Amino acid sequence: MLKPGDPGGSAFLKVDPAYLQHWQQLFPHGGAGPLKGSGAAGLLSAPQPLQPPPPPPPPERAEPPPDSLRPRPASLSSASSTPASSSTSASSASSCAAAAAAAALAGLSALPVSQLPVFAPLAAAAVAAEPLPPKELCLGATSGPGPVKCGGGGGGGGEGRGAPRFRCSAEELDYYLYGQQRMEIIPLNQHTSDPNNRCDMCADNRNGECPMHGPLHSLRRLVGTSSAAAAAPPPELPEWLRDLPREVCLCTSTVPGLAYGICAAQRIQQGTWIGPFQGVLLPPEKVQAGAVRNTQHLWEIYDQDGTLQHFIDGGEPSKSSWMRYIRCARHCGEQNLTVVQYRSNIFYRACIDIPRGTELLVWYNDSYTSFFGIPLQCIAQDENLNVPSTVMEAMCRQDALQPFNKSSKLAPTTQQRSVVFPQTPCSRNFSLLDKSGPIESGFNQINVKNQRVLASPTSTSQLHSEFSDWHLWKCGQCFKTFTQRILLQMHVCTQNPDRPYQCGHCSQSFSQPSELRNHVVTHSSDRPFKCGYCGRAFAGATTLNNHIRTHTGEKPFKCERCERSFTQATQLSRHQRMPNECKPITESPESIEVD
């Protein structure tokens, strides 16, 4: 054992400088420090375990007693000890604990706690002497090497006294650590307390699905709901097209003559409402006076009595929304949206389930017109009338027809006024009729270059309406209508004298019939007319009609001489050219008179 004051004794000690510095911080009032004297030498030479450091002594004690610095195993291990010796031993154990913490910081190893049966109860008593508030944790930070203090007790060195301390309850700590794992996912279909659970088609409040019009999706407004996950639009798109919802996307329209269209980016369920349609409100007087030239994006707003209130014009893109690019359907076969007026707004409602990638095409339905008591009838233009010069003049000259019936003739009806509706050259030839007088309008003539003739329908299935047997083919220049496409191809339009021969498939026109015939060959691969009996497809409506007669047995072409009937006109002409085949009924051997 080293003797106190031995000059060579320090050569045998390997003490970390950080360890000495820590002891100097614990005992700043000890002159040269606790290492002077026999107490320090005995403490360093004895293989005593290291324990965390205790709190600093009170200010009135300038220097701790020398006996309290030296652990005495004999006195500590004795079972009978006085209260004074117990308190002294507790402070000694705390000093050893402080030395252990400093040694851990300096890189020195300490003995395990299980090998210290004597110091364990004393350390537990020291910890129990400073209880913490229940269910609270203290988080402290210090900038110096002193120990981190928790609670309201006195700090260690000068650096430890000014350190910030944070408190949080055990419930808060448990919520931030494990609260996300206990989150409960609530399905959306459990929310049944919506006050607007209403079917607007039949104007009835319901608690569930409407049995007539399907699920209730009237609150699913797609306008203005932008998608952050959607792909960035091309930079050349205007601002009003960059805020598309995630359910739709911009596409090339299938309607001839129109550039853009809106298609479904995902499956849109039947009954989904899209809207409201945004635009500029126009009084009826302004529209009827001819101030609006483009009526393609014009919708009407009626009151409960069926009186026209105003128009909503979406022709100006900066004051409208992306809904203006939802095009009008040309026939019922391609229609998937219907126009619905709810209060003073226009909405589009999905009448069928729209698959992904299908273009959205809108038009009226029967419930829209029956709600206001406005009859929806098929109209056709009388070919004997003069050629109209404007769109409104052509619409006003049309006569209302009764639903077409093969077994009866068309009944004459009175001429009625047609209200302005969104019209495109390829839109379906329907109009809403009103009982008031005719409208005088000054609409300018539509540019012929932007017109496209209504070519063959995209679907050959018959329309599921009372007008399924009445197909109209309309000239894009003079608006004359024909029942067959071949008649439209043979039609010579007077609006363009230089190029009167117009193709029935596209908008091209030619000056000579031979040029038109050569051009029609390019459309020969298109066979939109399909037979419902055998499934064969044909390029023209006349060819299909001739083929259908082979299934039905109808022979409308009858020879006047021999009264034989044929299914096609070519068969009749060939029969009449044959001299030995066509024999009149009156020419018989019994009826021949001989002079």
Swiss-Prot record:
Compartment(s) of residence: Nucleus
Q: Which residues form the SET domain?
A: 246-365
Q: What class of enzyme is it?
A: transferase
Coiled coil start-end: none
Positions with biased composition (Low complexity): 71-90
The keyword ATP-binding belongs to this UniProt entry's keyword annotation: no
Q: Which reaction does it catalyse?
A: L-lysyl(20)-[histone H4] + S-adenosyl-L-methionine = N(6)-methyl-L-lysyl(20)-[histone H4] + S-adenosyl-L-homocysteine + H(+)
Zn finger intervals (C2H2-type): 473-495, 501-523, 529-551, 557-579
Q: For the region Disordered, what residue ranges are annotated?
A: 27-90
GO molecular function annotations of the record: histone H4K20 monomethyltransferase activity; identical protein binding; zinc ion binding
What's a Pfam family this protein contains? zf-C2H2
Example of a GO biological process term: neurogenesis
What EC number(s) has UniProt assigned to this enzyme? 2.1.1.361
- Please note every region of biased composition (Gly residues): 30-40
Give the UniProt entry's GO cellular component terms: nucleus
User: Which disease is this protein implicated in?
Assistant: Patent ductus arteriosus 3: A congenital heart defect characterized by the persistent opening of fetal ductus arteriosus that fails to close after birth. Fetal ductus arteriosus connects the pulmonary artery to the descending aorta, allowing unoxygenated blood to bypass the lung and flow to the placenta. Normally, the ductus occludes shortly after birth.
How is the quaternary structure described?
A: Interacts with HDAC1, HDAC2, HDAC3, CBX1 and EP300.
Fetch the PANTHER family from UniProt.
Answer: HISTONE-LYSINE N-METHYLTRANSFERASE PRDM6-RELATED, PR DOMAIN ZINC FINGER PROTEIN
The record describes the protein's role as: Putative histone methyltransferase that acts as a transcriptional repressor of smooth muscle gene expression. Promotes the transition from differentiated to proliferative smooth muscle by suppressing differentiation and maintaining the proliferative potential of vascular smooth muscle cells. Also plays a role in endothelial cells by inhibiting endothelial cell proliferation, survival and differentiation. It is unclear whether it has histone methyltransferase activity in vivo.
The similarity annotation says: Belongs to the class V-like SAM-binding methyltransferase superfamily.
Q: What is the protein name stated in its UniProt record?
A: Putative histone-lysine N-methyltransferase PRDM6
Show the taxonomic lineage.
Eukaryota, Metazoa, Chordata, Craniata, Vertebrata
This protein's gene is called: PRDM6
